[in-house]
Amino acid sequence: MMRRRSSLLLALAVVLLALPAPAGAADATPAPAPTAAPAPSAAEAAFLAKIMRDLPMRYPTAQSAIKAGYVRYTNEDETGAISYVNTKAWNTTDPDVPAQLWYDVKGRLIGADFSVRRDADATPAPKPERPSILGIDPKRTITIGAHVHFVTCDKTTGKCVYGKAVGAKKYAAIGDVEHPTADGLVKTGAVKDAASVTAVFLYPAIYDVPVWVVPNPLGQFADKNPNVVPSPHAGKGEDDPM
């Protein structure tokens, strides 16, 4: 679920922690509670009822998602989601085949992304009026910039590294960004050994609607879900090339 992480913000947080605390900082008010999403329309409620019923049956485990063509590409994000992508579904036309599925660290399906490409060639996209995706209010739609994601695995240990990416412009300078390759990643300097790359794909510029599949007291379109408890490792080790 790509609404989120920023290594720049993390770096800034580290810098701020190193600075002397201002007077009264100890009395600072706690962070505000997560915001609830606006109530769904009748059409949205019908859409939510369908995906909350059907998606857990179609993709009950991460392995079932993989068998259906989804590929894991992230670590657990700060909301507790590990994302799997189906690159054939960037233009989502079937609610049963989301562009992305999210699982928690225990392997439970918790959410999905439904999307539409903003451009045809991964160049910086214009921002016209946001579309309604599968009947969802356009106001719920977010925009995400183009970048190239990849996964590497150590052949000796079997350990894989997720959440790695390079900017689309950087990759386009050395090759076809619509069809990135392991060799292309070597040329960008993102990896040293092409053989270590187990997955590489363009994450195009998209309009996107993230939706919780598990019940959410804040609403299925809310950014966070109190019913999903992230692990202590959530939100760490992700690139943000955008």
Q: What spans do the regions from the language model cover?
A:
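Boundary at the C-terminal end of the N-terminal hydrophobic targeting segment
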Residues: 23-28
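Primary mode marks residue(s) on the alpha4-beta5-alpha5 output face of response regulator receiver
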Residues: 30-242
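Bacterial N-terminal signal peptides that target proteins for export
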Residues: 1-9
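Bacterial N-terminal signal peptides
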Residues: 10-19
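Hydrophobic alpha-helix-in-membranes signature
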Residues: 19-21, 209
